[in-house]
Amino acid sequence: ESQVDSSIGGKTAIDMDGVKNIVGAFHQPRAVLIDPDTLRTLPPRQISAGLAESVKMALTSDADLLDRIERSADLTAGLPEIIARSLTIKKNVVEQDPHEHGLRRVLNFGHTVGHAIESSAGGRLLHGECVALGMLPMCAPALRPRLIRVLRKCGLPTEIETTREALLPYLRHDKKGQGAAVTAVEVDEPGSF
């Protein structure tokens, strides 16, 4: 996950009192080193979790990348390209909105609901798995079947046993909300941001 998302952007945060990423700061690193070869040391579940962030980037900002992921015969062999394209998207967004006042909010696609799932799951699910699940209710109904196919291809979950009531307390404490309002990003079609 960190190779395609949190490694750049300068946003740091910690969980507190069961709420995901509630305390944080913005500070740009001097350098970021990314080596896709290190991914060979990870179990497949971790690779899948990282791919969720690339699917997020593709859905919001690069329809061609989504096609590439969807058509790929071997996602593992395609990881260097998928990582590079995901990082380019993130870099472009962060450069335009370094402090998350506008466009950068698109990077939160899947994260509002995903963080609620992650907090309520109590560590049973990886961050990327929760982001994958969080994207599903936030995309247009016509896009959802395609997203389900892509997530399954990436080895990610597409269903979870929970209730809206179980997630609401976590949604209300999401750092992106203002007052009682919950702020979430919706995607109508791939690459629309």
Regions from the PLM with identified roles:
Residues G18, E118-S119, Y170-L171:
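Glycine-rich, charged/polar anion/phosphate-binding loops
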Residues E1-R71:
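A glycine/threonine-rich phosphate-anchoring loop and its flanking beta-alpha core
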